[in-house]
Structures are given as structure tokens and as C-alpha cells.
Amino acid sequence: MTKLIVGLGNPGEEHEEDRHNAGFWFVDALAKQLGVRFESEKRFHGKVAKAKWEGEDLFLLKPSTYMNLSGQSVGALCRFHKIMPADILVVQDELDIKPGSARLKLGGGTGGHNGLKDIQAHLSTPNYWRLRLGIGHPRDIAGDGRPMDVADYVLRRPQLTEQKLINTSIENGLNILSLFLKGDTQTAMMELHSKG
């Protein structure tokens, strides 16, 4: 069964270190681990890497469409390779989870995440897997009583201490990926969620 792991982010050097690109960081780390490279694929509106996982095809995708149009890329690749929504894992940044924590779930709402909204529209279902990497909320981090604009926050690089925590959650996500891809999603969730 062909699987797809999508990292969400914004293309371009100016966004490489933004919190909003945590999904890209995850699939970049996975590609390195698997020894594969991303290649630009215009027909899929993104960069694609193809690997084998226990004899099955595994695609990694970084949409080049900007976050809010990610569904265009995901939909094109899924239609071409006949990948079902339940075989998709979308890796995203999550404001409502503290840095260092990650959560795995199937389906659910978009939580205001425009990338997820667009993917859901293109797949015509919310029933795909999400790996939510905590980046924290600006109200928790500002500390000076003044609210920080969410859009401004996600488009900035994290502080060094936050980055280390996000990197830990990426490692934790990579560590449960084997369980997830084998279909042992309950154990994968328990292991990941026990990390914090």
C-alpha cells in the first residue's frame, strides 16, 4: 500500500527557519534518514522524494504552493498515485501544543490551520492522519502581557530553546514512524504522547 507523508510549510529561503515550516523540517529529517532527495515535480506543485518502506512505496512531499494552497499539491499527487486519505500523514506546526510535544491523530477539525483546510477541501474528507508538532502560542511566550499577532509569530524563527524542543518533538515523531507505517497506530500514539 502506497503511503504519503506531507510536510507543511512555505517555500523560499526567507521562510526556511519560520515556525510555520516545522512540517518541512520533519520531512527533511526523514529524507536524510532514508537517504533520499527531494526533486521538484511541477505536476505535483511541490518537491517529492520517493523511498521504499518494507517493500512499499513511500512518498515524501513538500508543497511549493505556500501553506494556504497545500491541498492543490497533495490532491494532485494522491490522484496520480491513487493514494487513499487514510494512507496520508500530514505533518504540521501546532500553536495549541507546547514546543517539545507532538500529537498524532486521525481526522478532526482544522483548528484554523489554512493548510489543513485546503487539504481537506481537495481530499473531500478530514479523515487523513496528522502529526502535530508543537510550536506554542504567542500568548504563552510573549510574557510581557502584550498579545503578539499569530501570523507574525508563525512566520518568525523560534528562539534557540524553543528550536531545541521542536527538534526533540521531530525526533520523537521519527521514532514512532515505523509503528505508524506498519499500521500499529495505537502504539505509535501511546509512545509519542507519553513523551510529553
Swiss-Prot record:
The site (Stabilizes the basic form of H active site to accept a proton) lies at 93
Q: Does the keyword Repressor apply?
A: no
Q: Which Gene3D superfamilies match?
A: Peptidyl-tRNA hydrolase
Q: Where is the active site?
A: 20
Please give the catalytic activity noted in the UniProt record. Answer: an N-acyl-L-alpha-aminoacyl-tRNA + H2O = an N-acyl-L-amino acid + a tRNA + H(+)
User: What are the residue positions of the site described as Discriminates between blocked and unblocked aminoacyl-tRNA?
Assistant: 10
A GO biological process of this protein is: protein quality control for misfolded or incompletely synthesized proteins
Q: Which GO terms describe its cellular component?
A: cytoplasm
Chief place where the protein resides? cytoplasm
Q: Which PROSITE patterns match?
A: PEPT_TRNA_HYDROL_2
Keyword Nucleus appears in the UniProt entry: no
As for subcellular location, the record says: Cytoplasm
A GO molecular function for this record?
A: peptidyl-tRNA hydrolase activity
Kind of enzyme, top EC level?
Answer: hydrolase
How does this polypeptide assemble, per the annotation? Monomer.
The UniProt family comment states:
Belongs to the PTH family.
Biological role stated in the UniProt entry: Hydrolyzes ribosome-free peptidyl-tRNAs (with 1 or more amino acids incorporated), which drop off the ribosome during protein synthesis, or as a result of ribosome stalling. Catalyzes the release of premature peptidyl moieties from peptidyl-tRNA molecules trapped in stalled 50S ribosomal subunits, and thus maintains levels of free tRNAs and 50S ribosomes.
- Protein name from the UniProt record: Peptidyl-tRNA hydrolase
- UniProt organism field: Polynucleobacter necessarius subsp. necessarius (strain STIR1)
